[in-house]
Amino acid sequence: MTRSSYSSQLPIVDLSAADRDPQARRLLHAQLHSAAHDVGFFQLIGHGVTEAETRALTSAMHAFFALPEADRIALDNINSPHFRGYTRIGDERTAGARDWRDQLDIGAERAARTPAPWEAPYWWLEGPNQWPEALPELRTAALHWIERLSGVAERLLHELLASIGAPEDFYDDIFGPRAHPHLKLVRYPGSSGDGDGQGVGAHKDYGFLTLLLQDQVGGLQVQREDGNFHDVPPLPGAFVVNLGELLEVATNGYLIATNHRVVSPPGATERYSVPFFYNPRLDARINPLTFPYAETAPGVTADPANPLFAEYGRNELKGKLRAHPLTTARHHADLLLHPEAQPALSS
């Protein structure tokens, strides 16, 4: 299968076809193969997540952003050496530029871990979340969403691997109970005062799969083969799925991670989105995938400014240190002053 001419619209993939007859599953695999190899993005329907589950999360999210500013700032990401909590507008960076959005970062609820001097510093990324006392329903809805979408993503990954002739359970052992999922609740509060328009700058995700729930405002753009960024019109009830850099590494570039960005909505219009990142254990090493098309893989897209590593935690910590300079300065300045302590920044 070769990369082909494209439509500006993303492919639509119905995951429920996996549970129908063998012919329907074969068609699903053909669609997944093409979408992951040619585009790196697609719209996912038939995923089984109900409207009630979605409403529970989005209602709690809107209630969170409607809290008094002081209540949100009490959960400031800068309080957390684990990079959990609330990030104010402009405090996160992509490629060094300010992102015009605020957000709440949530992960698996675990005890704080302080790595010993001989341990990898990425273990700082394990720890508790910060929750607003006034909204207990947010904790319930967010942790349910993480569990629910982890199941959807696992199923999708199985079908995706099968679609390229690989063993569908090839990566099961790097996920499991110590997987490192990540959820963001994001608000884009209209255009910035300086007219920059960067909701979030162009980037690729560094995990395995991202499942994005977006509202109907729009603003997500994907870079296609022509080098231009194309709008992704919202599709009610669908998740926008994109492949992360680890799948590109695992397949030596046969499956592609694609640049994408968000353009700030115009004027005072607000945009809300919920990206879920399906990530393996922090200490997982991503072995090359064995599959029939491996000989045709073009190789991984090289970016000297953003080296990729087979050990997942090194990639995530590298990204967090760059994206959250204030939290990094407070809790992890030693990793910048002594980069040899953090292999991801020096290898």
Give, region by region, the residue ranges found by the protein language model:
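Internal, well-ordered alpha/beta segment that forms a basic, Gly-enriched binding/recognition surface
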Residues: 81-121, 128-129
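Eukaryotic endomembrane system proteins
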Residues: 108, 115-116, 122-148, 157-161
